[in-house]
Amino acid sequence: MPKNPLKILVDEMDDGMDEKLRSIGYDAFSVKKLRADGLKLHTDFSVINYAMENKMILVTRDTENGQACEENNIPCILLDSEEIFKIVLGKLKDYN
């Protein structure tokens, strides 16, 4: 468990990851759940801005969000097709 939990914002495509991260000690939130609680997080801009204002790391599959974070020095973990491909390759090694 991290000493100073990082604040993490999980984009809606990976709703549920926030719960898994919280279970191991991270301070994680889901865009989908925050929206259900009444926060106005309906656009990419508002999601990125929320992460920035709350000093959170954004976890997303949205390439444009990843690029926007990179351009504006906002911490982001982009789960794009290239990252997923690397995971698949790693798992395929188990079958060789």
Spell out what each predicted region is.
Residues 51-70:
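Acidic, metal-binding active-site segment of PIN/NYN-like and related structure-specific nucleases
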Residues 2-3, 9-24, 29-33, 37-39, ...:
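Acidic, PIN/NYN-like endoribonuclease modules and their adjacent C-terminal/linker elements
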Residues 8-12, 57-60:
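Short, hydrophobic beta-strand segments that form beta-sheet elements in well-ordered domains
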